[in-house]
Amino acid sequence: MIEKTYQPSDIESRMSRVWEEAGAFKAGRPERREAEPFTIVIPPPNVTGSLHMGHALNNTLQDVLCRFERMRGRDVLWQPGTDHAGIATQMVVERQLMERKEPGRREMGRARFLERVWQWKAESGGVIVNQLKRLGASCDWSRERFTMDEGLSRAVAKVFVELHRAGLIYKDKRLVNWDPKLLTAISDLEVKQVEVKGSLWHLRYPIEGKAFDPSDPSTYIVVATTRPETMLGDTAVAVHPENAKLEYLIGSNVVLPLAGRIIPIVGDDYADPEKGTGAVKITPAHDFNDFEVGRRHHLPQISVLDREGRLTLSENEDFLRGLPSGALMLAEEFDGMDRFAARKAIVARLEEFGFLDKIEPHTHMVPHGDRSNAVVEPYLTDQWYVDAKELARPAMAAVRSGETAFVPKNWEKTYFEWMENIQPWCISRQLWWGHQIPAWYGPDGKVFVAETEDEAIGHALGYYVEQGVITAEQGAGMARDPAKRDGFITRDEDVLDTWFSSALWPFSTLGWPDETPEVRRYYPTNVLVTGFDIIFFWVARMMMMGIHFMKEAPFSTVYIHALVRDEKGAKMSKSKGNVIDPLNLVDKYGADALRFTLAAMAVQGRDIKLSPQRVEGYRNFATKFWNACRFAEMNDCVVPARFDPTAATETLNRWIVHETARTACEVTEAIESSRFNDAASAIYRFVWNVYCDWYLELAKPVILGEDSPAKSETRAMVAWARDEILKLLHPFMPFITEELWAVTAERTRLLTLTEWPNKADQTRKRRTLIAAADPFIGSEPITDLLEPYFRDDAAEAEIGWVVDLVTAIRSVRAEMNIPPATLAPLVLAGASDESRARAQRWSDVIKRMSRLADISFADQAPAGAVQLLIRGEVAALPLKGIVDVAAQRTRLGKEIAKADADIARVDLKLADQNFIANAPGEIVEDEKEKREAAAARKAKFVEALERLKAAE
């Protein structure tokens, strides 16, 4: 029996247990071993994480696909798991140690600290997994993986070794994003750009061979910089080769202020003649652009900052090389200073000696570590790199050939732009938590890369015996006795970038490098659902690794969803205080309501503006359907054995079969096309409007009337249509549908394992064939594609006429503010015989639902009547004596004027180029939406006014 009140929390906990106990989501179920597989890998959330709205959207869409395909009989594997999240996890544990006043990481030592991290993971690392289960994620949780599981770690080591052997992993000295607080290189994704109100310092660099005179511009060249603290590492000044004012200086030298070093003036396109002074200082060791300029001109790289962001000069051989002896005292003065203190000290000295030309206020973007919030330094250091350019070629070819497609397609352009300009991928991190790089160093620094330490020792002993460093006898002894080789080779202390192991996720989770049955069955995967922000960091790298090691792209479709913003369109952030916690919404309105909201708003390519009111609205939708099911139960509506809905004789019942099949087609096609919003809209319209508002209302007189064949058929059809709704709604609202499925009849299987409406599948197959021949299939009416025995044009024409007539009359009553108690007459003008017969058959229903006094027929519409066009025929509402036409005309005129004012106000804003250029994108979009709403409002009032004119 259905409970009187819909209580989401009770249902959700109960249904979660039911699914888990039944193993409902396990891949490879016995009855599906011969079925076509369908695979999705979850974007593994950080083990430190908790559910945010992006997770909620991402996993809702994945779950819709998985439940849909599972009901279509496929062997679904939704592979779950979490990412070890190197920096984030290490920071969490270090913070915990600090809060508990325990020894820090370095005091503990690596081994003990890693034990502590694993302990933290065991105690606290499952939070987000449990939250995903609350959302209803139908993953095969028995296969949950962690990026540092033993099997995945073995895959990481094998990939590293094979890429190194192929020359695709190497060590190099390059600039990296360096976090001076965390003391590690970080990826671009871990860098946030912060707008800072700073200064632009214009510095005078004396031209070699001329006596420097601050008052004589011919004796110096002015360069502008936001980072005077790095100027001691300058190795050139660049001007554009076509800079008419400065090109004559190319080839000459300047004297670096304070240091006295002679550095060249080079010609390079990087210098913008229209920007600043037209001359730029080149510091290859402290700027990414300067690094490339330095490589083009073979400039030395002088790093003047250490790992902690302090000036390092006194013992810096690169800095001291070629430095005049008189500059050493200044070097000692700045040595060891924090970079920002050094900035002030250096500027003061520059001003003292006349090298400071001017200071201008300057607002610019400064990179910060997203976790430490420290200003990130471009830092020159030895790191491990992947030759991403080589791996990118086949990854681009896979998308160009159609092996992998992006949805929406415009994201392919973004993918190609990044891949075509891809840089070497820095994969080493100066952390302890993560996959330690499988490289060992011999006594002379020789590198040995191997999957295990034993293999590395074997390579090292063989090499040093061959080189004569040790004898064969010594080598054999060291091989036999671990004590003799202790400390002979030392492992690289760095760990791999978290994205390195994540790049292997589609196949490492299946047991690779072993040839497991899972690898053979579930790779490649079908769909990847992810956000646009990690196309480069994750999607592209999975493509590279998957194609290189598996010889196939890891997925056939990449669906890119948009951002979830607040109701005003602003990006959610803690600083703004506008973050919406999905779990709060789940607690208040239920997981089903949140899921349906996110799916209904997931328009391809458009960010979601989320408000709690929308979630509340869909909770009300769930409640309405719940109450409809209670009505069916209370009136003994059940599906008899061997019930055939296509054998119905009652027009109303034939109509609901037609509408159900039509909706099944729409929902199926929309989900297959990743148009989640269209699928949700179709099922919402059907449940709320067709089933609840029309079918049940029209069926009530029969159901509540005397026993008859019509009553029996109608009760059966009410239950049958309810069951079809449960199936179609299940991917979006799994909890309420599974509960109602269980309590409304004796079932042989869970709803989540029940067959999707089959006739919709048959329609889909036919539609696929048509689409192959007609690229404009999207414009074809969905009713043209219904299977013949699920299509009933006569029933649709009859009930559709009743629905259209009642809807139009209700609309006029609302527009004219006619009170519900006031009954109006209806005249069908020039009605066909069929329309006359329909009006008579449905007279009581039409009068009751439209609040009519009577229905009559005439050759023409009477004077003073509002005319409605219903399927090509005129229905007239004589309103004389019912409506004050003059007052309504005045009211509608005011509404139109108000809408015009709103449109004009928005148009004025949108015509302002300053507003368009400076306002945040979400504000501009909000204004455009306001205009659309005002225009729609105006159109409605204009239409009402036109109708009113006919009543005069």
UniProtKB/Swiss-Prot annotation:
PROSITE patterns: AA_TRNA_LIGASE_I
Reactions that this protein is recorded to catalyse: tRNA(Val) + L-valine + ATP = L-valyl-tRNA(Val) + AMP + diphosphate
Compartment list: Cytoplasm
Cellular compartments per GO CC: cytosol
SUPFAM superfamilies assigned to the protein according to its UniProt record, in alphabetical order: Anticodon-binding domain of a subclass of class I aminoacyl-tRNA synthetases (SSF47323), Nucleotidylyl transferase (SSF52374), tRNA-binding arm (SSF46589), ValRS/IleRS/LeuRS editing domain (SSF50677)
EC number: 6.1.1.9
Alphabetized UniProt keyword annotations: Aminoacyl-tRNA synthetase, ATP-binding, Coiled coil, Cytoplasm, Ligase, Nucleotide-binding, Protein biosynthesis
Purpose of the protein: Catalyzes the attachment of valine to tRNA(Val). As ValRS can inadvertently accommodate and process structurally similar amino acids such as threonine, to avoid such errors, it has a 'posttransfer' editing activity that hydrolyzes mischarged Thr-tRNA(Val) in a tRNA-dependent manner.
Protein name: Valine--tRNA ligase
Organism of this sequence: Nitrobacter winogradskyi (strain ATCC 25391 / DSM 10237 / CIP 104748 / NCIMB 11846 / Nb-255)
Gene name of the record: valS
